[in-house]
Protein backbone atom coordinates (compact mmCIF):
# COMPACT_ATOMS: atom_id res chain seq x y z
CA UNK A 1 0.00 0.00 0.00
CA UNK A 2 1.55 3.36 -1.00
CA UNK A 3 2.38 5.73 1.81
CA UNK A 4 1.72 9.14 0.34
CA UNK A 5 -0.03 10.52 3.39
CA UNK A 6 -3.55 11.88 3.63
CA UNK A 7 -5.35 12.80 0.42
CA UNK A 8 -5.83 16.57 0.22
CA UNK A 9 -9.43 17.76 0.39
CA UNK A 10 -10.78 19.55 -2.67
CA UNK A 11 -12.14 22.99 -1.89
CA UNK A 12 -15.72 23.57 -3.00
CA UNK A 13 -16.10 26.89 -4.78
CA UNK A 14 -18.88 29.14 -3.43
CA UNK A 15 -22.14 29.14 -5.39
CA UNK A 16 -22.68 32.00 -7.88
CA UNK A 17 -25.94 33.39 -6.43
CA UNK A 18 -25.38 33.57 -2.65
CA UNK A 19 -21.57 33.23 -2.64
CA UNK A 20 -21.92 30.48 -0.03
CA UNK A 21 -19.81 27.32 0.18
CA UNK A 22 -22.57 25.61 2.18
CA UNK A 23 -25.08 26.21 -0.62
CA UNK A 24 -22.59 24.87 -3.18
CA UNK A 25 -22.03 21.72 -1.11
CA UNK A 26 -25.78 21.25 -0.79
CA UNK A 27 -26.31 21.57 -4.55
CA UNK A 28 -23.46 19.13 -5.26
CA UNK A 29 -24.94 16.59 -2.84
CA UNK A 30 -28.42 16.98 -4.31
CA UNK A 31 -27.22 16.53 -7.89
CA UNK A 32 -28.26 13.29 -9.62
CA UNK A 33 -26.40 11.89 -12.66
CA UNK A 34 -24.26 15.04 -12.97
CA UNK A 35 -27.24 17.32 -13.65
CA UNK A 36 -26.03 20.33 -11.71
CA UNK A 37 -28.26 22.82 -13.54
CA UNK A 38 -31.39 20.93 -12.51
CA UNK A 39 -30.15 20.66 -8.91
CA UNK A 40 -29.41 24.40 -8.80
CA UNK A 41 -32.87 25.29 -10.17
CA UNK A 42 -34.56 23.14 -7.52
CA UNK A 43 -32.36 24.55 -4.75
CA UNK A 44 -32.80 28.23 -5.65
CA UNK A 45 -36.58 27.90 -6.14
CA UNK A 46 -36.79 26.14 -2.76
CA UNK A 47 -34.88 29.01 -1.13
CA UNK A 48 -37.30 31.52 -2.70
CA UNK A 49 -40.24 29.60 -1.22
CA UNK A 50 -38.41 29.38 2.13
CA UNK A 51 -37.81 33.15 2.10
CA UNK A 52 -41.51 33.82 1.42
CA UNK A 53 -42.64 31.56 4.25
CA UNK A 54 -40.09 32.63 6.90
CA UNK A 55 -39.79 36.30 6.04
CA UNK A 56 -36.03 36.03 6.62
CA UNK A 57 -33.14 36.29 4.18
CA UNK A 58 -33.08 33.03 2.17
CA UNK A 59 -29.46 32.06 2.83
CA UNK A 60 -29.73 32.92 6.55
CA UNK A 61 -32.85 30.77 6.86
CA UNK A 62 -31.09 27.94 4.99
CA UNK A 63 -28.03 28.16 7.27
CA UNK A 64 -30.28 28.11 10.36
CA UNK A 65 -32.10 25.03 9.00
CA UNK A 66 -28.76 23.23 8.49
CA UNK A 67 -27.58 24.30 11.97
CA UNK A 68 -30.75 22.84 13.51
CA UNK A 69 -30.02 19.46 11.90
CA UNK A 70 -26.28 19.21 12.76
CA UNK A 71 -25.58 16.35 15.20
CA UNK A 72 -23.01 16.95 17.96
CA UNK A 73 -22.56 13.31 19.03
CA UNK A 74 -23.07 9.98 17.28
CA UNK A 75 -22.42 6.34 18.09
CA UNK A 76 -19.77 4.16 16.49
CA UNK A 77 -19.55 0.39 16.81
CA UNK A 78 -16.54 -0.80 18.77
CA UNK A 79 -15.76 -4.47 19.27
CA UNK A 80 -14.33 -5.33 22.69
CA UNK A 81 -13.70 -8.95 23.65
CA UNK A 82 -16.44 -10.58 21.61
CA UNK A 83 -19.06 -7.93 22.35
CA UNK A 84 -19.92 -4.98 20.11
CA UNK A 85 -20.63 -1.72 21.90
CA UNK A 86 -22.20 1.43 20.50
CA UNK A 87 -19.68 4.01 21.71
CA UNK A 88 -20.70 7.69 21.69
CA UNK A 89 -18.18 9.98 19.98
CA UNK A 90 -18.17 13.70 19.19
CA UNK A 91 -18.74 14.60 15.54
CA UNK A 92 -16.14 16.72 13.71
CA UNK A 93 -17.51 20.01 12.36
CA UNK A 94 -17.10 19.08 8.68
CA UNK A 95 -18.89 15.76 9.29
CA UNK A 96 -21.69 17.61 11.15
CA UNK A 97 -22.37 19.66 8.03
CA UNK A 98 -22.11 16.61 5.74
CA UNK A 99 -24.57 14.61 7.85
CA UNK A 100 -26.99 17.55 8.09
CA UNK A 101 -26.96 18.03 4.30
CA UNK A 102 -27.37 14.29 3.69
CA UNK A 103 -30.29 13.98 6.12
CA UNK A 104 -32.07 17.08 4.77
CA UNK A 105 -31.90 15.76 1.20
CA UNK A 106 -32.88 12.20 2.17
CA UNK A 107 -35.93 13.29 4.16
CA UNK A 108 -36.90 15.88 1.53
CA UNK A 109 -36.94 13.15 -1.14
CA UNK A 110 -39.11 10.94 1.09
CA UNK A 111 -41.79 13.62 1.61
CA UNK A 112 -45.22 13.53 0.01
CA UNK A 113 -45.41 16.97 -1.64
CA UNK A 114 -45.60 17.19 -5.40
CA UNK A 115 -42.28 18.10 -7.00
CA UNK A 116 -38.84 18.32 -5.45
CA UNK A 117 -39.08 22.10 -4.96
CA UNK A 118 -42.09 21.63 -2.65
CA UNK A 119 -40.46 18.74 -0.83
CA UNK A 120 -37.13 20.49 -0.26
CA UNK A 121 -38.68 23.81 0.77
CA UNK A 122 -41.02 21.93 3.14
CA UNK A 123 -38.16 20.02 4.76
CA UNK A 124 -36.02 23.18 5.03
CA UNK A 125 -38.95 25.06 6.59
CA UNK A 126 -39.51 22.21 9.06
CA UNK A 127 -35.79 22.15 9.91
CA UNK A 128 -35.86 25.95 10.31
CA UNK A 129 -38.68 25.49 12.85
CA UNK A 130 -36.93 22.55 14.59
CA UNK A 131 -39.25 19.80 13.37
CA UNK A 132 -39.42 17.37 10.46
CA UNK A 133 -37.66 14.15 9.52
CA UNK A 134 -34.09 15.45 9.50
CA UNK A 135 -34.40 17.04 12.96
CA UNK A 136 -35.99 13.82 14.25
CA UNK A 137 -32.99 11.89 12.88
CA UNK A 138 -30.62 14.24 14.75
CA UNK A 139 -32.63 13.79 17.96
CA UNK A 140 -32.58 9.99 17.53
CA UNK A 141 -28.80 10.09 17.04
CA UNK A 142 -28.39 12.18 20.20
CA UNK A 143 -30.72 9.85 22.11
CA UNK A 144 -28.66 6.81 21.04
CA UNK A 145 -25.48 8.52 22.23
CA UNK A 146 -27.13 9.44 25.54
CA UNK A 147 -28.38 5.88 26.07
CA UNK A 148 -24.89 4.46 25.46
CA UNK A 149 -23.05 7.01 27.60
CA UNK A 150 -21.88 4.16 29.86
CA UNK A 151 -19.60 2.92 27.06
CA UNK A 152 -17.92 6.29 26.51
CA UNK A 153 -14.72 5.01 28.16
CA UNK A 154 -14.20 2.69 25.14
CA UNK A 155 -13.40 5.67 22.92
CA UNK A 156 -10.27 5.38 20.82
UniProtKB/Swiss-Prot annotation:
Say which domain of life the source belongs to. Answer: Bacteria
What keywords sit in the KW lines? Ribonucleoprotein, Ribosomal protein, RNA-binding, rRNA-binding, tRNA-binding
> What processes in GO biological process is this protein linked to?
translation
Q: Which GO terms describe its molecular function?
A: rRNA binding; structural constituent of ribosome; tRNA binding
Q: Which InterPro entries match?
A: Ribosomal_uS7 (IPR000235), Ribosomal_uS7_bac/org-type (IPR005717), Ribosomal_uS7_CS (IPR020606), Ribosomal_uS7_dom (IPR023798), Ribosomal_uS7_dom_sf (IPR036823)
Q: Which Pfam families match?
A: Ribosomal_S7
Gene3D superfamilies hit by this protein: Ribosomal protein S7 domain
Q: Sorted alphabetically, which NCBIfam families does this protein's record hold? A: rpsG_bact
Please report the name of this protein according to its UniProt entry. Answer: Small ribosomal subunit protein uS7
The gene from which this protein is expressed is: rpsG
Amino acid sequence: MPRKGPIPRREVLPDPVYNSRLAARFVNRMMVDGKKGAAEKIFYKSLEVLQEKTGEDAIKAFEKAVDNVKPFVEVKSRRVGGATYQVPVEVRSDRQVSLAIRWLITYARARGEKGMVGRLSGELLDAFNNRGGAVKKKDDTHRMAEANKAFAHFRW
